[in-house]
Amino acid sequence: MSDARRLVDKLWSYCNVLRDDGVGTIEYTEQLTYLLFLKMAHERAQRELNPQQIVPSEYSWQTLLDAKGDALETQYRHILEELGKRPGVLGTIFRKAQNRIQDPAKLKRLIVDLIDKENWSATGTDIKGDAYEALLSRGAEDIKSGAGQYFTPRAVIQAIVDCVRPTVKDTVVDPAAGTAGFLLAAHEYASRGSESMTRTEKNHLQHDFAYGYELVDGTARLAAMNMLLHGIGNPAGDSLIEVRDALISDPGQRWSVVLSNPPFGRKSSLAMVGADGFEVREDRAIERQDFVVTTSNKQFNFLQHIATILDINGRAAVVLPDNVLFEGGAGETLRRKLLRDFDLHTMLRLPTGIFYAQGVKANVLFFDKKPAAERPWTDRLWIYDLRTNQHFTLKQNPLRRQHLDDFVECYAPEKARSERTESERFRSFTYAELIARDKVNFDVTWLRDESLEDTDNLPAPHLIAREIIEDLTAALVELEAVAAALEPASGGTPA
């Protein structure tokens, strides 16, 4: 058994102990995050060479070891509250933190038997990082927590990064970082051959290479800790995960690579309390000088934001739902802009059944930002169809990296795109062909769905049932969006 697997099993065993108290996987991982950070800060303060006091002594790990019973719970709550007021990484990890372990005896057991017995600073970053990632993955499977919406399939992330090929010279950002999956994969790829890098390059990789924005406090803390455990950033410095709505404004900074899977959902909304005391949600159209369209559509706004923050000649790969390909109005305007001002060179049509959010039909758009020019920058768009006649589920038949091998081979990141060749699943469409389509529709298919024509080639019944559920769920999401748009902007009615 690998060291990472041993650590995962050990951490998971304590999660099962707390499950009876109503503590879910993600809540447990949050508590681990707080305690792990405190223990690692304690180890850093105790080391012989260049000791560093990250956490004030009155909030230190030692105060938890010394406390018992109700005093332990009180001290733990006090630490969480006070450290959440601090700037930098401390503030990101402990912002709005709460104790979810109500039994002091179980909290003590977690502190003494699990966390304190490990020398976390001496444990390799690959072991700590892999163990933490495994916990996050299991947390994504916890449907009740809703954490799956922040989790992009690792096989998809790895394939995207293998195509974009970030280097130590790049700066990478994810404006919807989730638990930092894209940032970690990009860092791992760029770190290959680090033994021959200069000290300046290694310092850049650790402190300036990756940056992320995340709206949700709990998810941001998981992302920040995930990066620290993988050796990215400085626990005593500024956080590489910024807790904010990335869409609010242009940050001013530009990055050479953008990798992102913006949250699914059709509209951005703003929660307010009406005069009668009930919550009212109003669609929020984002108005920015750098945006070409004003819309409340979340995906369109993220696409516009990414277009802004990407540096000239920068590369982007963005996971977006099907409606971005064909929706009229703002959608058509943005598709025209993509073809004209960017080199939109590749699209991967993802299969269904691979996301924890049910009913999602998504694609990956790969594009490069170009300087202003009179002619359109897109020459041809290469589309790889990994959806037609493909049947995946989260558990029985999960998507794995090898399922994307053919796509990466067709993408051929090491070659000029002029050397690409078409195949059964890989076709190219010229700018003239795309711009001539109704509403500049990118929703292009050419493969025949064999399951509709050959009854002997039907998927297994449980796969058919799962696809029906996903289609119905997707339809329900659309109907809910319509219903929300039709609701009057007034307070709710008491139940």
Placement of each model-derived feature along the sequence:
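Conserved S-adenosyl-L-methionine
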Residues: 146-260, 264-276, 285, 289, ...
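Non-catalytic, mostly N-terminal accessory regions of nucleic-acid modification and defense proteins
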Residues: 1-168, 231, 235-248, 349-353, ...
